[in-house]
């Protein structure tokens, strides 16, 4: 089986939703999205990208660095979309990491 995988730094899922829908229309098996900028409470929006795909995501965050650099907007956010009829199972595993900003030795 050939597997088509795509990764895309979408710099806002909402701003690039049509391009992302184009990826699913191209029969990509798995689509990884970075910088979705979707907050945790908006991850349900992933289900509306394409009815033939399942999805899982991690919400964007607000941090002091993001607030200063991004004029108060969140940063980050990840998502994975995969075909519902795929011959594999996807399990979501969350590893909580809390980055520290500033000087590093």
Can you describe what each PLM-predicted range is?
Residues 1-105:
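Short phosphate/oxyanion-binding micro-motifs
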């Amino acid at each position: 089986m050939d597997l088509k995988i795509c990764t895309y730094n979408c710099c806002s899922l909402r701003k690039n939703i049509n391009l992302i829908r184009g990826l699913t229309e191209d029969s990509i098996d798995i689509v990884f999205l970075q910088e979705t900028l979707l907050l945790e409470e908006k991850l349900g929006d992933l289900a509306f990208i394409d009815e033939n795909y399942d999805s899982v995501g991690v919400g964007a965050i607000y941090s002091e660095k993001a607030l200063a650099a991004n004029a108060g907007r969140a940063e980050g956010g990840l998502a994975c979309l995969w075909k519902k009829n795929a011959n594999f199972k996807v399990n979501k595993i969350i590893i909580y990491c809390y980055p520290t900003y500033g000087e590093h030795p």
